Every structure is written in structure tokens, then in C-alpha cells.
């Protein structure tokens, strides 16, 4: 029997309704809340056959002590994906693969933001270690604004071994490091690529860094020496998109 997990917030619930409405067991909505976005979600849920239950704000607060925006959904948990899912994803590719590897990101807000950027820029899968890293939590789902439901999130036992396997499959591994001598825009990102970002504060682990085919830095002009991992994620993924959509030289 599938485990049930609560998610909350308009964007998170909307993402599940769009991607996998069959996962929603019950939808709890704050009664008499004047919010057109909420009403639209309720109408959509009912049209999809989802059971909607009206509760007072006090009752809803007992289901979630986070900022729920008047809506909480009991959902069947997504099946955990592991290394075996990567092979299937890569075999199905018709265009150059783009993967995102997060080496030990622990903050759920950062993971949620990275998932949102990953979905926006067409990342095929986000890969993270099972240990010493955050998984997909209700906070992650809320920050991701539905992207957690649409972007495969694969947790692996041994990140170094996974990187080795990806390289054998023809994927180039591009790590980010403040000490790198090469700028991200100087690397050809038009082929099968995995962008690797390190944890908050510590950056890439030594073993991960040693396995990268390239190390790149994001050019900074101010006094700060590094960026938040989710900000760096968006910049790197945009650069991949920029290169891939650039006109071919005449």
C-alpha cells in the first residue's frame, strides 16, 4: 500500500493536479476563503474526480503548520527512483541529454528552487546522493511550484560510481568550483551534459570534483566570492540553453 504524504500551497497542489491527479487521495480546502486561484483549483479537482473537503482555517492548520494558502492535499508518495531509472531515461533521449547533479544539498528551499529551475530549462533528471542530502519534502514541493511532480528526482547510493557510469554512457560531467580557471561559457555544453553543483558552503566534495571532466566557474564582478547553489543552478542551466539555441555559425 502506498504511503500518504501531505503537500500544501497553491503551486504545489496545482502541480500534482496537472501531472498526476490520481495521486491525490483527499483535498482539504479552507472554507469561505476569497481567493480566485483557490476556487479554480477546487473546480479543477472536482472535474478530475478528486474528493474535496471543506475545513475551517483552524482545522486546516492542524493538518499543516506551514503557510498552506488555504489548501492541503493528502497524496500517495511518488515511487522513489534509483540508478536503474537513469538508463531508461538516457535510452529514450532524442536530443542531447541535460542532467543536474546535486552533491549534498541539504536545504529544502535550495532543492526546491533547483528543481524549479531544472524543470524550466528542460533537465531530464535531477540526481542526488541518498545520504547527507535532503530529499523531496513538503517544503521542497511548495518551493518547487509543481516542478517536483514533473522532473524525475533520482537518489543514488554512490554518487562517484554514478558519475563514472554516466561518463561511460557518453555524458560529459561539468562541475562548478570557485577556483576553476575556465568560465562556464567557455565550455561546449551542446552535447550530453551533466551539471554538478556542490553543497551549501562546502561546494563539491573532493571525490566528486576529481571525477568531473571539466571544472567551471561563474564569472562574478562584485565583491562576493560565491553564489547560493540555487542561483548558480539557474545561471548554469541558462548557459546550457543559450548555447543549444544559438544560431549555427554561417
UniProtKB/Swiss-Prot annotation:
Compartments where located: Cytoplasm
Enzyme class: transferase
The enzyme's E.C. designation: 2.1.1.185
SMART domains referenced in this protein's UniProt entry, alphabetically: SpoU_sub_bind (SM00967)
Record GO terms (molecular function): RNA binding; rRNA (guanosine-2'-O-)-methyltransferase activity
Gene3D superfamilies associated with the record: 3.30.1330.30, 3.40.1280.10
Keywords, in A-Z order: Cytoplasm, Methyltransferase, rRNA processing, S-adenosyl-L-methionine, Transferase
Binding residues annotated for S-adenosyl-L-methionine, in chain numbering: 198, 218, 227
Catalytic activity: guanosine(2251) in 23S rRNA + S-adenosyl-L-methionine = 2'-O-methylguanosine(2251) in 23S rRNA + S-adenosyl-L-homocysteine + H(+)
The UniProt record lists the keyword Aminoacyl-tRNA synthetase: no
Family recorded in the similarity comment: Belongs to the class IV-like SAM-binding methyltransferase superfamily. RNA methyltransferase TrmH family. RlmB subfamily.
Described function: Specifically methylates the ribose of guanosine 2251 in 23S rRNA.
Name of protein: 23S rRNA (guanosine-2'-O-)-methyltransferase RlmB
Lineage: Bacteria, Pseudomonadati, Pseudomonadota, Gammaproteobacteria, Legionellales
Amino acid at each position: 500500500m502506498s504511503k500518504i504524504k501531505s503537500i500544501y500551497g497553491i503551486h504545489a497542489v496545482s502541480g500534482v493536479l496537472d501531472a498526476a491527479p490520481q495521486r491525490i487521495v483527499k483535498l482539504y480546502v479552507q472554507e469561505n476563503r476569497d481567493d480566485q486561484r483557490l476556487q479554480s483549483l477546487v473546480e479543477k479537482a472536482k472535474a478530475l474526480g478528486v474528493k474535496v473537503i471543506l475545513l475551517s482555517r483552524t482545522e486546516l492548520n492542524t493538518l499543516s503548520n506551514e503557510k498552506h494558502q488555504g489548501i492541503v492535499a493528502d497524496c500517495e508518495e511518488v515511487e522513489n527512483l534509483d540508478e536503474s531509472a537513469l538508463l531508461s531515461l538516457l535510452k529514450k533521449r532524442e536530443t542531447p541529454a541535460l542532467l543536474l547533479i546535486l552533491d549534498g544539498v541539504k536545504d529544502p528551499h535550495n532543492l526546491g528552487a533547483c528543481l524549479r529551475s531544472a524543470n524550466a530549462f528542460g533537465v531530464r533528471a535531477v540526481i542526488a546522493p541518498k545520504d547527507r542530502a535532503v530529499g523531496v519534502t513538503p517544503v521542497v514541493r511548495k518551493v518547487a511550484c509543481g516542478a517536483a511532480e514533473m522532473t524525475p528526482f533520482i537518489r543514488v547510493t554512490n554518487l562517484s560510481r554514478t558519475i563514472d557510469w554516466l561518463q561511460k554512457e557518453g555524458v560529459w560531467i561539468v562541475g562548478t568550483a570557485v577556483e576553476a580557471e575556465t568560465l562556464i561559457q567557455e565550455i561546449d555544453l551542446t552535447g550530453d551534459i551533466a551539471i554538478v553543483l556542490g553543497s551549501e558552503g562546502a561546494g563539491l566534495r573532493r571525490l566528486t570534483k576529481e571525477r568531473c571532466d571539466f571544472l567551471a566557474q561563474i564569472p562574478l564582478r562584485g565583491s562576493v566570492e560565491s553564489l547560493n547553489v540555487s542561483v548558480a543552478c539557474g545561471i548554469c542551466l541558462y548557459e546550457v540553453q543559450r548555447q543549444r539555441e544559438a544560431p549555427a555559425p554561417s
